[in-house]
UniProtKB/Swiss-Prot annotation:
Forms part of the ribosomal stalk which helps the ribosome interact with GTP-bound translation factors. Is thus essential for accurate translation. This is Large ribosomal subunit protein bL12. The keyword Ribosomal protein applies. CDD domains: Ribosomal_L7_L12. Belongs to the bacterial ribosomal protein bL12 family. Keywords: Ribonucleoprotein, Ribosomal protein. Homodimer. Part of the ribosomal stalk of the 50S ribosomal subunit. Forms a multimeric L10(L12)X complex, where L10 forms an elongated spine to which 2 to 4 L12 dimers bind in a sequential fashion. Binds GTP-bound translation factors. The gene is rplL. The keyword Ribonucleoprotein applies. GO terms for cellular component: cytosolic large ribosomal subunit. GO terms for biological process: translation. It comes from Nitrobacter winogradskyi (strain ATCC 25391 / DSM 10237 / CIP 104748 / NCIMB 11846 / Nb-255). Pfam families: Ribosomal_L12, Ribosomal_L12_N.
Length: 125
């Protein structure tokens, strides 16, 4: 049997676009539609009334701008993401770009504080 942990790791590393493409390929291969399952899951309950507002649990930290201290921001991006110097520099210079995706609220706010302290402008989405 295939190494399931490797499959999980590979799927976790996919970008959103790659995950969407994978879903499309699996739908074609297996002859199913993910849209039907989503529609059933999103259907309101028979109890009526307004559904409770759900608090967002996963955030994307987006570097909106590097600001005046670009070198400091690059250093922080490297420390947060583990990217190499060139990759971190490209990310900072290409702002607005996501620095980290799918992180918990407390971690996202911590990353935001680090980047803002270094001089960057940050958004949480």
């Amino acid at each position: 049997m295939a190494d399931l942990q490797k499959i999980v790791d590979d799927l976790s590393a996919l970008t959103v676009l790659e995950a969407a493409e994978l879903a499309k390929l699996l739908e074609e291969k297996w002859g199913v539609s993910a849209a039907a399952a989503v529609a059933v899951a999103a259907a309101p309950g028979a109890g009526g009334g307004a559904p409770a507002a759900e608090e967002k649990t996963e955030f994307t930290v987006v570097l909106a701008a590097a600001g005046d201290k670009k070198i400091e921001v690059i250093k922080e991006v490297r420390a947060i993401t583990g990217l190499g110097l060139k990759e971190a520099k490209d990310l900072v210079e290409g702002a607005p770009k996501p620095v980290k995706e799918g992180v918990a609220k407390d971690e996202a706010e911590k990353i935001k504080a680090q980047l803002e302290k270094a001089g960057g402008k940050v958004e949480l989405k």
